[in-house]
C-alpha cells in the first residue's frame, strides 16, 4: 500500500516517522517554505525538515519526493498522479483536498484529528478542549470526507486532562500517542475500513480558527476561565492585556485561593491587588483572583514576576485596562 503523507507543523512529524520506517511511504506533501524568526528568513516546514533528516539517516532515498505546492491545482495533481499513491494520510496539512485530488487515491484518505470526534470538529480542537475545561480529549483517525471532520471513525484513543495542559504540551502528547493508533489502522486497513463507524451528528461541536485579537483578556470573566484561556492560547496567539496603553503578555498564571474578603472588597476587575511571594502578581477578575507568574512586555523577554517588577517598580499601581 503506497502512502502519501500530508502534514506541515511539528505535531505531524511522529506520524511521518512511523510511516517512513514501517510502511511504504512514496511521497510527502507539505506547505512551502515560509518566513520564520526575527529575521523572517525562509524556512522549510517542520515536516519537510523531518523528511530531509530521514534522507540523511538513509531511511528514505536521496531523490525522495517532497511536494510543496502553493496551490492545489492541475500542475500539482500531475505530480501527485506520477507517484501512484494508493492512500493519503493527513495530519495538520493546512489545506482542504477537493474531489479531483481525492480521486487520485484508490483507497481514499484518512485524517489524524486531535479530539474525540464528533466533539471539536474544526481547525483548533486542542485549544477548544482546554478552553471548555474538558476532562477528556483524545485522537481520532477518520476517513477524509467532503465536509470537514465528518468522516467515519477508524479508531480513537482517549487522553485524560488534568487542568495543567497548554495547547503546546497537549498537541505534542497527541502527536506521540497517535502513532500506535495509526500503526493499528494502517496494519489492518481493509478490515478497519469495513468496521468504520459514522459519527453521531447530534453530538457534534465545532471550533473556529483562532485569531491574534482573540488573545485579549477580558478581566470581567471568571479567574478560572481566564486561566484556561492562557493555557489554551499557549503558544499561539498568546494572551495579552494593556496597562497605560502598553501591551503586556500574560504567559503563565494560576488560580489564587488564599484571598481575604478585605483584599477583594469593592475592587474592580482588572485591579492589581498586590503580590504573593509564592504565587505572583494578584489580579482581581469578575469572579476570583488570578496569580500571574510570568509576563512579557512587547519586544522584551519573558520574565518571572519578581524580575519583571524589578524592572518596573510602579507596575503594581492601578490595574489593567478593561
From Swiss-Prot:
Keywords: Protein biosynthesis, Transferase. CDD domains: FMT_core_Met-tRNA-FMT_N, Met_tRNA_FMT_C. (6S)-5,6,7,8-tetrahydrofolate binds at residues 115-118. It comes from the Bacteria. Pfam families: Formyl_trans_C, Formyl_trans_N. GO terms for cellular component: cytosol. Belongs to the Fmt family. This is Methionyl-tRNA formyltransferase. It comes from Treponema denticola (strain ATCC 35405 / DSM 14222 / CIP 103919 / JCM 8153 / KCTC 15104). The lineage of its organism: Bacteria, Pseudomonadati, Spirochaetota, Spirochaetia, Spirochaetales.
Amino acid at each position: 500500500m503506497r502512502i502519501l503523507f500530508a502534514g506541515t507543523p511539528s505535531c505531524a512529524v511522529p506520524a511521518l516517522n512511523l510511516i517512513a520506517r514501517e510502511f511504504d511511504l512514496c511521497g510527502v506533501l507539505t506547505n512551502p517554505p515560509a518566513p520564520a524568526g526575527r529575521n523572517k528568513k525562509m524556512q522549510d516546514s517542520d515536516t519537510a525538515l523531518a523528511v530531509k533528516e530521514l534522507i540523511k539517516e538513509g531511511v528514505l532515498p536521496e531523490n525522495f519526493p517532497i511536494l510543496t505546492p502553493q496551490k492545489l491545482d492541475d500542475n500539482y495533481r500531475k505530480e501527485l498522479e506520477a507517484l501512484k499513491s494508493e492512500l493519503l494520510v493527513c495530519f495538520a496539512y493546512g489545506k482542504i483536498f477537493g474531489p479531483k485530488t481525492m480521486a487520485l487515491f484508490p483507497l481514499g484518505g484518512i485524517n489524524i484529528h486531535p479530539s474525540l470526534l464528533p466533539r471539536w470538529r474544526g481547525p483548533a480542537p486542542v485549544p477548544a478542549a482546554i478552553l471548555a475545561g474538558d476532562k477528556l480529549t483524545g485522537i481520532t483517525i477518520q476517513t477524509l470526507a467532503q465536509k470537514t471532520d465528518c468522516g467515519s471513525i477508524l479508531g480513537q484513543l482517549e487522553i485524560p486532562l488534568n487542568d495543567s495542559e497548554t495547547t503546546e504540551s497537549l498537541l505534542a502528547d497527541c502527536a506521540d500517542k497517535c502513532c500506535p493508533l495509526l500503526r493499528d489502522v494502517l496494519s489492518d486497513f481493509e478490515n478497519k475500513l469495513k468496521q468504520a463507524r459514522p459519527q453521531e451528528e447530534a453530538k457534534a461541536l465545532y471550533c473556529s480558527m483562532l485569531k491574534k485579537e482573540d488573545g485579549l483578556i477580558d478581566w470581567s470573566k471568571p479567574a478560572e476561565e481566564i486561566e484556561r484561556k492562557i493555557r489554551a492560547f499557549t503558544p499561539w496567539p498568546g494572551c495579552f492585556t494593556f496597562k497605560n496603553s502598553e501591551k503586556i503578555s500574560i504567559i503563565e498564571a494560576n488560580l489564587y485561593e488564599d484571598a481575604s474578603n478585605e483584599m477583594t472588597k469593592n475592587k474592580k476587575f482588572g485591579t492589581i491587588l498586590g503580590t504573593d511571594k509564592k504565587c505572583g502578581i494578584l489580579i482581581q477578575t469578575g469572579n476570583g483572583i488570578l496569580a500571574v507568574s510570568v509576563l512579557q512586555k512587547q519586544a522584551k523577554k519573558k520574565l518571572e514576576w519578581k524580575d519583571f517588577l524589578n524592572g518596573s517598580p510602579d507596575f503594581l499601581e492601578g490595574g489593567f485596562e478593561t
